[in-house]
Structure formats: C-alpha cells, structure tokens
C-alpha cells in the first residue's frame, strides 16, 4: 500500500480536473483547476501562489515547501490548459475502461498535474529537507507565451 497514492481518491480528483473545460484561454476553467491544485498543496502544508501574467489566459500556480529559499532541489513543471474547446468535458467526461482512463486532457496532462500532489506528499513526509517547487502554467498548448519568462 502506497501512503501517498490512493487510486480511488486519485480518480475522483482526476474526474474534477478532466470534467472541467480548460482549453487555452478558458480562464474560468483554468482558474477552477488552479484553485483546486492550490488547495491540494495547501492541505500538504505547502505555500502556494497564483500568478497571472495575462488575464486572457488565466492564472498559473506555484507551490513550494520552502518558500523563503531561493534554491530549488526538485522542480516539477506541468500545465493546466488543454487543446479542447468549451463543451468537450461535458461531451466526453472522464471514463475508466479497464486500465485506460479517457477524457479531455486525462493523459496530457491532467493526470500528470495531479500526480504532482502525490510526489509533493512523498517529499513532505519522507524528504522534507528537499526544496520542492511545483509550477503549473496556463498556456503550454500555445507555446507558453505569457508564462515563459516565469
């Protein structure tokens, strides 16, 4: 049994992410995902910050376990946007088909985004001395024009 990963809980959380439209520029959906991720990290005792570089693309999320340190030992980077238009989440919500999990953004990259919370839980419990920084951007699918400098 892995104390940092529970498949049932992971799939429940993944359904929230996948069933939220978050195509690049879908600010409401990206903001919902950003808030969800920030709560997950805050629940682990991490510092979080929402960063908006362009209002029309939505926020990015930064989470750290040693926020006062300028050094980073472990950097996890991902994105919250997808290529799918508004309405796709309702048309194709998360489904589990045997060992396959399907839905808009399930593989790229909402499962990876959520997996960062499992890795953060591990670091917090097992290697708290490591300076962990997690960055989720809002515009990767169009080349990260607003978050690139971050």
Identify the meaning behind each predicted range.
Residues 109-150:
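Acidic/histidine-rich catalytic neighborhood of metal-dependent amide-processing enzymes
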Residues 2-104, 125-128:
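Acidic/His- and Gly-rich active-site-bordering loop/insert found
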């Amino acid at each position: 049994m892995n104390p940092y990963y529970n498949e049932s809980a992971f799939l429940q959380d993944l359904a929230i992410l996948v069933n939220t439209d978050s195509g690049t520029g879908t600010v409401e959906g990206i903001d919902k995902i950003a808030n969800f991720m920030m709560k997950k990290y805050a629940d682990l005792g991490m510092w979080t910050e929402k960063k908006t570089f362009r209002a029309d693309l939505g926020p990015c999320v930064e989470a750290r376990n040693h926020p006062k340190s300028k050094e980073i030992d472990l950097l996890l980077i991902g994105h919250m946007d997808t290529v799918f238009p508004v309405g796709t989440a309702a048309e194709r919500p998360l489904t589990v088909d045997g060992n396959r999990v399907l839905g808009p953004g399930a593989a790229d990259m909402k499962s990876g985004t959520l997996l960062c919370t499992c890795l953060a839980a591990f670091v917090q419990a097992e290697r708290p001395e490591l300076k962990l920084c997690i960055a989720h951007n809002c515009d990767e699918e169009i080349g990260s024009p607003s978050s690139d400098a971050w």
